[in-house]
């Protein structure tokens, strides 16, 4: 199962209807928790997800609305008796803050800290890129390797059936038949998480060609001066990011508390997002990952 669970959508100040940040990506057997702000543990309960589903925690930067929920989440994992390793990724410059937060949680969890200081691969399929915020900040990108989808009619025409199908998949060639002769390319799915940044090259690299992009939408286009001052994206810039990367679906979040209704922000995004599907997130949304695409080949 692949699903994106929205736990909180506010930025610096929570509101009556929006909790601080928190997002859980359920990706087959893994659960990647992004930027757990205050109240994340309770939001998980309301969303119907379990702390035991978390296998990896990814923090973009150490501003409080992106990490102050960490002790509660870790304590809940200990309480629930989580036995599997939990990997925690964060910018190396914020290690003192992260270690202080971790120290507040009960001991006993197999927690493995992975500070990173440059862009690149930080785990199999998971990479980071530097963003442009007031402190060191990184976005995350998850990439599934490409695969092949077998075509039954081509297998039948080639006379391949039963155990030979598995052999062909493993070896790539069987009795003169190549795997690519009886299949089409199945591009791996791609996900990107871009928070707290002004427009920058790192954000563009993260968003490039992804099926699902989660991006901040802190300010309206009318408040571009504030966005520039605090190094955040405007709605229009979020749309540009999606259009430039040919993104499939864009989920907007991290809304300023000054906007009670965010639909006008979504409208500003859509005006510049090209063919990208645009969704304004609400707390406790559960969004199925977009269906994988199949390419002829």
Regions found by a protein language model. Give the residues of each.
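Active-site neighborhood of phospho(di)ester-bond hydrolases with catalytic His/Asp-centered motifs
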Residues: 34-37, 54-62, 91, 192-197, ...
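Active-site environment of divalent metal-dependent phosphoester hydrolases
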Residues: 13, 65-66, 97, 134-136, ...
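Active-site metal-binding motif and surrounding structural segment of the metallo-beta-lactamase
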Residues: 38-89, 113-119
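Metal-dependent catalytic neighborhoods of phosphoester/phosphodiester hydrolases
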Residues: 69-77, 98-101, 260-269
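Divalent metal-coordination and catalytic microenvironments
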Residues: 4, 35, 44, 61, ...
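Active-site-proximal loop/helix segment associated with metal-binding centers of metalloenzymes
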Residues: 125-206, 212-214
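Conserved beta-strand hairpin/beta-sheet module of binuclear metal-dependent hydrolase folds
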Residues: 1-47, 140-142, 183-194, 212
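Binuclear metal-ion centers of metallo-dependent hydrolases, dominated by the metallo-beta-lactamase
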Residues: 200-297
């Amino acid at each position: 199962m692949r699903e994106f669970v929205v736990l909180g959508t506010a930025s610096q100040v929570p509101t009556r209807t929006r909790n601080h940040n928190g997002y859980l990506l359920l990706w087959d057997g893994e659960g990647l928790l992004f930027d757990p702000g205050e109240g994340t543990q309770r939001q998980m309960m309301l969303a119907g997800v379990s702390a035991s589903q978390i296998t990896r925690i990814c923090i973009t930067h150490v501003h409080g609305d992106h990490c102050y929920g960490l002790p509660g989440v870790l304590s809940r994992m200990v309480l629930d008796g989580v036995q599997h390793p939990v990997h925690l990724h964060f910018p190396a410059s914020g290690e003192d803050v992260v270690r202080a937060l971790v120290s507040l949680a009960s001991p006993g969890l197999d927690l493995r800290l992975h500070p990173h200081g440059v862009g690149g691969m930080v785990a199999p399929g998971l990479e980071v890129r530097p963003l442009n915020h007031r402190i060191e900040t990184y976005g995350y990108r998850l990439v599934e390797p490409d695969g092949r989808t077998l075509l039954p009619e081509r297998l039948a025409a080639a006379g391949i059936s039963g155990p030979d199908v598995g052999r062909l998949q493993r070896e790539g060639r069987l009795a003169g038949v190549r795997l690519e002769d009886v299949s089409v390319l199945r591009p791996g799915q791609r996900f990107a998480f871009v928070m707290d940044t002004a427009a920058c090259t790192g954000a563009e690299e993260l968003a490039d060609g992804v099926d699902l992009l989660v991006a901040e939408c802190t300010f309206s286009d009318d408040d571009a001066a504030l966005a520039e001052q605090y190094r955040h994206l405007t709605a229009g810039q979020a749309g540009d990011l999606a259009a430039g990367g040919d993104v499939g679906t864009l989920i907007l979040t991290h809304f300023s508390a000054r906007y009670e209704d965010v639909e006008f922000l979504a409208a500003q995004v859509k005006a510049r997002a090209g063919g990208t599907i645009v969704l304004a997130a609400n707390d406790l949304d559960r969004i199925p990952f977009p269906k994988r695409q199949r390419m002829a080949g």
